[in-house]
Amino acid sequence: MSQTFYKKGFLALAVATALGVSTFVQADLKIGVAGPMTGANAAFGEQYMKGAQAAADAINKAGGINGEKIKLVAGDDACEPKQAVAVANRLVDQDKVIGVVGHFCSSNTIPASEVYADAGVIMITPGSTNPQVTERGLDAVFRMCGRDDQQGIVAGDYIVDVLKGK
C-alpha cells in the first residue's frame, strides 16, 4: 500500500477526531498508531508509522488542526491479540489518544476495537479485512480497505472479465 493511502486515512482520522474534540483543550492532539512494530509483520507496522508520520508532519507544518499539533503515539501489538488489547488500553488510559490508526491483523483489531469503542475513541484500520471489524456496529470503528467477503468477488470478476480466465 502506498504512503499516500496511509496519509489520506490518517488525515481523515485527524480531522474526524479534531471535530469531535473541538471543546477539549490539550497541547497536542495525540493519535495512536497501533500495529506490528515487531515480529513477522513488522514491515506493515513500519509502513503505518512512516505514513502516519509523513501525514502528521505535513499537517503540523501547515499549522496543525485548529492550531494544535499532532503527536503520534506508537503501540506495538506484534499481531498478537492479547498484546493488541494491552496496547489499546494503554493508548486510551495512559496516553489519552483521541484516535487510533490501526491495527493491522484482524485478529487484533476485533478485540482492540472493543476497547476504543467503549472509550469513545475513533479507530480506523488500514489493513483489517475481516467483516466482523465493522459488522458489529461499533460507532467509532472504521476501515480503509475492502472486506474479505468483497475482495474475492472483485478478484473473481476481474479474472473472468479482464483476464478471460487466463
What are the residue ranges of the model-derived segments?
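Boundary at the C-terminal end of the N-terminal hydrophobic targeting segment
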Residues: 25-27
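Extracytoplasmic ligand/sensor domains, especially the bilobed periplasmic-binding protein
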Residues: 82, 94-166
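Second-shell loop/turn segments in exported
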Residues: 37-41, 74-77, 98, 139-145
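Extracytoplasmic "Venus flytrap"
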Residues: 32-51, 75-82, 104-107
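Bacterial N-terminal signal peptides
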Residues: 12-22
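Signal peptide-proximal N-terminal region
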Residues: 49-72
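Bacterial N-terminal signal peptides that target proteins for export
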Residues: 2-13
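Structural motif
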Residues: 69-94, 151-154
